[in-house]
Amino acid sequence: MKPQWQQYINIIKQVVKPALGCTEPIAAAYAAAVARALLGVEPDSIAVQVSDNLYKNSMGVFVPGTGKIGLAIAAAAGAIAGNPDAGLEVLAVITPEQVAKAQALIDAGKVTVERTETAEFIYCCVIAKKGDREALVKICGGHTLIAEKRLNGESVFSVDSTQAKATGSICEGVDITIESIYRFAQEVPFEEIKFILEASELNGKLSDEGMANPYGLEVGRTMKSGIAAGIIGEDLLNKIVMLTAAASDARMGGANLPAMSNLGSGNQGIAATIPVVLTAQCYKVSEEQLARALIMSHLGAIYIKSHYPPLSAFCGNTVTSAAASMAMVYLAGGSFEQSCFAIQNVISDSSGMVCDGAKASCAMKVSTSSSAAVRSFLMALSSHNVSGQGIIATDVEKTIKNIGKMILNGMSSTDVTIIDIMSA
């Protein structure tokens, strides 16, 4: 195996993993669970401080197992019922009695949530107290990246800035491009990448749940009703939109099922997975070809997103769906050049979509970017592509750099404005 291939596998395993619930409030639940474990007893008060972006993405989304929204219930539930060893599945097991106990803590005014100024896009600090005992847990740079733990003011764990590598910089120093990802996905031994098939299983179950039960805006179920009424057809495009949205409906609606996430986002894990799986079914390819396509989609998404901060005013479903579209071209028998066309087309189509927090309507954004992925891969197969127009360069690598530049240099004030509007 080529030396960098093991690096690619390690990257995927590090940031493509099961996550129960929207990862921003779950970060608070995880920090609270770790703080409770450090404290040794259930706390009688909890203080939560978060970055603006983490706050934004926690305002409108349900916390699994609670039927409730927000950072306060996430932190309280994490402290009462969370498993500190379960990472993003910290709330996998929670009872109604524990939810009631967490809510009682909130109702008594014992849980506070504040925004704090920080250069970190992902930042959460939880202070749990019991009498005169106090435990502090600080997360920085990634949803489960613990930077510091303190007990009664004494440091028991800390990492310096060189060790605390943010998930957003995961590709730094790695020899990786769209072409190297494409070749890796095609040529790496199947046994080395079989693990990615779990993404199909987990996100497929979430989609089934969203179709079977009413969650959020019921985008997927609404599409199904349209098909049943004969208003729209059950073709590949509409199936992808319907089933991808259904998974997001369930996730944003608090379904007690994990998503296979991508770089800290469950919705983006869904967008990287379900369109690829349905395309594989359409073309009747082997399990091995599906695994290779999923690797292409997930690693492609990680690579593109490594060019900008992990949380921003930009909806990451756009570039995730661009990577999915690349993989769809591969499944349809297209060339590498046509896979690049697909990326260019999706980014041209949907790059104006902003992130205004995690909430039920994310299912609509997931469906929008996924529909762009289908259109774009079909155009690419006919060798139709956007090139040298607007922010789309003549070369896919330059386009990816342009996206990063647009977000880093051009959207910071947009992010502040969105957060101000949401907080008003």
From Swiss-Prot:
GO terms for molecular function: L-cysteine desulfhydrase activity. One of its GO terms (biological process) is L-cysteine catabolic process to pyruvate. It holds the Pfam family SDH_alpha. Belongs to the UPF0597 family. It comes from the Bacteria. Transmembrane segments: none annotated. This is UPF0597 protein Sbal_3070.
